[in-house]
Amino acid sequence: MFRKYLTITSLFAIFFYSLYSQADNIFSNFFGKELDVAPVKNSLYLEECGDCHFPYQPGLLPARSWQKMMKNSSLQDHFGEDIVFDEQQIKKQLLNYMITNAADNSPFKRSRKIMKSLSYNDAPLSILKTPYIRRKHSDIPQRLIAQPEVGTLSNCEACHKKASKGNYDDDEIHIPNTNLRYND
């Protein structure tokens, strides 16, 4: 009898440990603490993209957008910058990371909402061009966006203090110089 309980307890412990160790979000989801998008943990992506701008999580755009963005013609005018990689292998590794973690390949809630807002062939090059993100920011007065602490909606971390951790939750929004909160 003791052996049976020991076996069941061991299997239960192994099951929960495997949930915890296999993916950051599975264990958290079990307890209702789901992240919005997968945080960026890829050192190459952080170095190559994060050196110039906030390293936007791949889960904020579909794979087709990342593929379009990484084409040579798009890289020649990447939001006003000419992007050149020292090696083609770097470009391939970055694209692979982006596609693997893109919104259409992600189980995270914000990624799913972004995908639901897009039509089948939409491939926006900017996160701000996705209908979901546009809707979420539509009620924010321009004067709050234009203030020096924010400057532009592409400055996610100005208001989303935990953006780098993949948390864009409404409860974590702090618009500089206000006590305002914007919710769904």
Question: PLM ranges: what are they?
Answer:
Residues 24-50, 55-92, 96, 102-184:
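Sequence context surrounding c-type heme c attachment/ligation sites in exported
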Residues 16-18:
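N-terminal signal peptide c-region/cleavage motif recognized by signal peptidases
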Residues 1-9:
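Bacterial N-terminal signal peptides that target proteins for export
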